[in-house]
Each structure stands twice: as C-alpha cells, then as structure tokens.
Amino acid sequence: MTYIVTSEFELNQVAAPNLPLAPVQYTPQYIDQLNNVLRLYFNRLDAILAQLKVGVGDIDGSGIRFSYGAFSDLAYTTLNGGINNSVTTITVVSTTGFPTAGQIRIESEVIIYTGTTPTTFTGCTRGARGSANVAHSTGVAVTKIQSPVANTAVPMYMNTTDFSNSVTLVDTTKLTAAKAGLYNLQWSGQFNNSDTTEHDLSVWLRINGVDVPASTGFVAVVSSHGGIDGHLIVGWNYYVQLNAGQYVEIWWSTTNEKLTLECYGPSTGPTRPSTASVVATLSFVSALP
C-alpha cells in the first residue's frame, strides 16, 4: 500500500498503476503508453519525498499532518465595583469565557450563578460549597471554578480550542474524533482544596457515554495550610480506540465539595501567566488494530 501527501498535507492512498495489456507483437505505441503510466505513478511517489523534505537530503515527516486536538478551560475577570455579602447580581469587567450558568470564586467565597450578561453574573447564591459569604472590594479577581457536589460524578468542562485538526470539542466536554483510530489522550487538572483536611478525588474516562473499564485514577489533594489553600496539578495519559464520530470525556468526583478545579488569572511576585483548570489533548497514533 502506497500513500501520497496531498496539498493539505494529509496522507491519502495512491492506487497502483493501471498497466496496459501487452500486445502479442511489439509495438512502439504500447511502450509509449506503458512508459507514460509508469512515469505518472512514480511522479506521484516522488511527491511524497518532495513534501516531506525540509532541507537538502532531509526527510523527517514534518510535512505530514495527523488528527489532533488541544483544549483547555480558562476564564477570569475582576470585580467592577465593591459588593456586600448579600447582593445576587455581581458586576465585573467582562463575563467572556464563563458559561451562562456555573460557579465562580471571589477570594475565599464560592458563588453559584444562574445567568450572565456581558458584564454581570445574575441569580447568585452566595457562600456556596461550604464557603462564607463576605464583602469584596472592587478590582479583586473573579475566577471560574468546577465544583461538584461531594461523591457526584461530573465531566470536566473546557471552553477553549487551542489547536484542532479533525478532533473537535463538542458540548464543552466531548473530545470528538472525525476519523477512526488509536488516539493518545493526555490531560491535566489544577485542583484546589480550601478545607483544613486532605481530600480525595477520582478521574476516569467515558467513551460515547459509557465508562471505560480500568480507567479510574485516585488522587489525594493536600489541605489548606497557613491560610493558603492546598494546590495540586495532576495528569496522566490514556490510549483510546475511537471510531469515526465517537467522543471521549474525562469524568471526575470528589469526596468533599471544598475540593475544586480552578482557573487562576495572571499573578505577580514574580510575574506569572494565567492558569487553566483543565488541559486535554487528543492525538492520532495509529489506524485501528
């Protein structure tokens, strides 16, 4: 089986040459026809090397593009005005990147909201997930969090497509493959524990809504200490078999609602960039066995 790189830098099968039948007696026309068929075939094969080369004599496969997708979850803003401990509409600089309903953290307070406008969170439930409802000053950070009820299975959500070719993010949780194959799924999560006790979480996979056997991993996240929340970034990889159009999701649960997945905005002392709560990549490895 022979393949050729198309103008889109993807490998497509090249059909074997359709050689003309040889006549009983030699004819110049047959030789010309045979030469033309073979010349066309080998010219197409030469195109493989021509598009894979990055320099004179170099062949490293850099011209090939396989199926892949890289996705993350990141949303943060700041308060646009101070708030007391009871208001249910919170004004911020922007709600871009936040879901229409979800959870946010302002300092140590977790808030559940049911709606958004371009600059407000509405229908807020203050002091959620065991936190205290308190007043906050203008300009403090507001970050998106993922915080399930204790011992409840939920998927990990993502809101950003960083890179994609034939692998897409559907409904904020489903890493969907357009082409069948064996894929490498790599993920990491930034976990936050605001409780004074260490808590556990578990992470596993579902393919098309069905739990994948032997995919669960268990992690313990350290407790808060010295007034600072416990933090832990964890991750590992899986090989998954997907048919065309199938999707894989990352699911998790925690033993305590004070253990959350959290984004963070840029920080100082020293200056550091923002932090995504979830990062996941799905990369084609091979055709199905």
Language-model features and meaning:
Residues T2-R65, G69-A70:
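N-terminal low-complexity, intrinsically disordered "leader/linker" segments enriched in small/polar
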Residues Q51-D73, Y113, T143-E198, I207, ...:
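Terminal (often C-terminal
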Residues G57-Q146:
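Autoprocessing Asn-cyclization modules and mimics
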Residues V92-T96, D171-L182, Y238-A244:
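Extracellular and analogous surface-interaction loops
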Residues I112, S202-R206, E249:
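Beta-strand signatures of extracellular beta-sandwich domains
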Residues G226-W251:
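Short, surface-exposed tryptophan/glycine-enriched loops
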Residues W251-E257:
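Short beta-strand-plus-loop segments that form exposed binding edges in beta-rich domains
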